Amino acid sequence: MTQIDYTRAAKYFLLADFFKGFKLGMKYFFAPKVTINYPHEKGPLSPRFRGEHALRRYPNGEERCIACKLCEAICPAQAITIDAEPREDGSRRTTRYDIDMTKCIYCGFCQEACPVDAIVEGPNFEFATETREELYYDKEKLLANGERWESAIAHNLELDAPYR
């Protein structure tokens, strides 16, 4: 003789699991929407966000890059090419600083390796192009990016400073 489990039978016939699921569905149906209207609204970015590359300058206008080539050496995708020559005062500066953005994997190693914070990955993530050639960044393009995003880059580096 089998014993009947009345609690289980009541749950089955009264559709308890169905109504639990229905209640959960209605909770999310009437909850406020979390989707943002992207082109018109933008979500917050982390200070560590790695976007479009930029070369920075010192406040006096001199470029920061000292041509140590650490970023070129550490780049796992070999996307960075640097040529440099010494100046009359003995310091070295780059004559060519190219980044092939089609190769770049946005790992951030170049930014971490740079001893003077010359190369950084800025907050810009909207840099789609129509041709492949526009993704080959030269020194002038990188310096222009640095000038355009300097305030945001400096703010993000300041926020990230305790963790570096």
Curated annotation (Swiss-Prot):
Record's subcellular location: Cell inner membrane
According to Swiss-Prot or TrEMBL, what is its membrane topology? Peripheral membrane protein
Which domain of life, per UniProt?
Answer: Bacteria
Q: How is the cofactor bound?
A: Binds 2 [4Fe-4S] clusters per subunit.
InterPro entries per the UniProt record, alphabetical? 4Fe4S_Fe-S-bd, 4Fe4S_Fe_S_CS, NADH_quinone_OxRdtase_chainI
Per UniProt, which keywords does this protein have? 4Fe-4S, Cell inner membrane, Cell membrane, Iron, Iron-sulfur, Membrane, Metal-binding, NAD, Quinone, Repeat, Translocase, Ubiquinone
Reactions catalysed, semicolon-separated, are: a quinone + NADH + 5 H(+)(in) = a quinol + NAD(+) + 4 H(+)(out)
Tell me which cofactor or cofactors this protein depends on.
Answer: [4Fe-4S] cluster
Binding annotation for [4Fe-4S] cluster 2: C75, C104, C107, C110
- Residues forming the 4Fe-4S ferredoxin-type domain are 55-85, 95-124
Residues bound to [4Fe-4S] cluster 1 are: C65, C68, C71, C114
User: Does the keyword section mention Plastid?
Assistant: no
Q: Which GO terms describe its molecular function?
A: 4 iron, 4 sulfur cluster binding; iron ion binding; NADH:ubiquinone reductase (non-electrogenic) activity; quinone binding
Documented EC number(s):
7.1.1.-
Q: What class of enzyme is it?
A: translocase
Q: Name one GO cellular component term.
A: plasma membrane
Note the HAMAP family from the entry: NDH1_NuoI
Q: How does it assemble?
A: NDH-1 is composed of 14 different subunits. Subunits NuoA, H, J, K, L, M, N constitute the membrane sector of the complex.
Family per record: Belongs to the complex I 23 kDa subunit family.
Question: What name has this protein been given in UniProt?
Answer: NADH-quinone oxidoreductase subunit I
Protein's organism: Jannaschia sp. (strain CCS1)
